[in-house]
């Protein structure tokens, strides 16, 4: 068996590739490529392997789209391919293609304390289910369970469940967005574009015209306290993140913890800490006590997708995580 495997984390814009030490799981030699510069994922992989001159026979790539069979067509990119054909072309013994949040969930057993920031709750209960979700371009969701000394990721498209308002303000937001776009999923309010939707709905609810703002603009104005509407939007985003996380905790009894990934929350960490997130997480009526001790963690590891891709592959090859 070769010492290293190829791991990757591919989104709509960039492909990040690295080497994973098969014995230890350590990630090294990470490099990011612009997906727009290459005709296919296979082409990017060939460039990476040529640059690093390392013998690789196994690989695992996490991709931001549903993986339901051999044919993979990326949601936010033109790349499409057969897993079996790419494996053959590259001469690999193993090639795993997994959902990006499957990879993030598989990273959790590999994370150290310095990779996590806790938001309330007690200690996680060993062996109990885990939930992970995160807002970025969209809203990713996965669960993780431990069965017979193996970690099993339960992927899905939980970001597309219905947005479930639980206050008068949230109900007004739903009404405005539904009139605009029809079905309002959780992702429509818990993502970069979702933050814009919240801002626009807040302004329109007051019979005013919203500015043409980007997520970055809203966050910056909220943190500078220079725009009341932006601050309300960001506050509401945090609250809805809490409600959604609490729903995940209830659904599978995730006493192993609820983990937040994605690139949005770290941009306003102090604001998030002071927000109504945890109160909303526990705002479950008769089941408030049920979720009270469930810890929530923000993942601050630089490359959880690469780490989790490596963990998934190593477990597939027979290693115990």
Swiss-Prot record:
Annotated CDD domains: ASKHA_NBD_GLK (cd24008)
EC number(s) reported in the record: 2.7.1.2
GO cellular component: cytosol
Coiled-coil residue spans: none
Pfam families: Glucokinase (PF02685)
Molecular function via GO: ATP binding; D-glucose binding; glucokinase activity
Keywords of the record: ATP-binding, Cytoplasm, Glycolysis, Kinase, Nucleotide-binding, Transferase
EC category name: transferase
Biological process (GO), any one: glycolytic process
Transmembrane segment boundaries: none
Binding site for ATP: 8-13
Disulfide bonds: none
Catalytic activity reported: D-glucose + ATP = D-glucose 6-phosphate + ADP + H(+)
Entry's localization field: Cytoplasm
Record-linked InterPro entries: ATPase_NBD (IPR043129), Bacterial_glucokinase (IPR050201), Glucokinase (IPR003836)
Record-linked NCBIfam families: glk, PRK00292.1-1, PRK00292.1-3, PRK12408.1
Similarity comment: family membership: Belongs to the bacterial glucokinase family.
UniProt name for this protein: Glucokinase
């Amino acid at each position: 068996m070769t010492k290293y495997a190829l791991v990757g984390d591919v989104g709509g814009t960039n492909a990040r590739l690295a080497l994973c030490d098969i014995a230890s799981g350590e990630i090294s030699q990470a490099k990011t490529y612009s997906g727009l510069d290459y005709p296919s994922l296979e082409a990017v992989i060939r460039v990476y392997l040529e640059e690093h001159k390392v013998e690789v026979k196994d690989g695992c790539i996490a991709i931001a789209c549903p993986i339901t069979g051999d044919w993979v067509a990326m949601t936010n990119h033109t790349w499409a391919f057969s897993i079996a054909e790419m494996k053959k072309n590259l001469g690999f013994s193993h090639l795993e293609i997994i959902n990006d949040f499957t990879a993030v969930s598989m990273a959790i057993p590999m994370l150290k304390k310095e990779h996590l920031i806790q938001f309330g709750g007690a200690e996680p209960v060993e062996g109990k289910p885990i939930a992970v979700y995160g807002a970025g371009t969209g809203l990713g969701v996965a669960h993780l369970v431990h069965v017979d000394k193996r970690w099993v990721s339960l992927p899905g498209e939980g970001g597309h469940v219905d947005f479930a308002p639980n206050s008068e303000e949230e109900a007004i937001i739903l009404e405005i967005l539904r009139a605009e776009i029809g079905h309002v999923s959780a992702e429509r309010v818990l993502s970069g574009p979702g933050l814009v939707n919240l801002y626009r709905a807040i302004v329109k609810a007051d019979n005013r015209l919203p500015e043409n703002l980007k997520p970055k603009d809203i966050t910056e104005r909220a943190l500078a306290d220079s725009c009341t509407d932006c601050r309300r939007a960001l506050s509401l985003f945090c609250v809805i993140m809490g409600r959604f996380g609490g729903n995940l905790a209830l659904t599978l009894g995730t006493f192993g913890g609820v983990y937040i990934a994605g690139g949005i929350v770290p941009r306003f960490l102090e604001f998030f800490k002071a927000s109504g997130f945890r109160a909303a997480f526990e705002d479950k009526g008769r089941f408030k006590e049920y979720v009270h001790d469930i810890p929530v963690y923000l993942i601050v590891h630089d490359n959880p997708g690469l780490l989790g891709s490596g963990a998934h592959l190593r477990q597939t090859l027979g290693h115990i995580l």
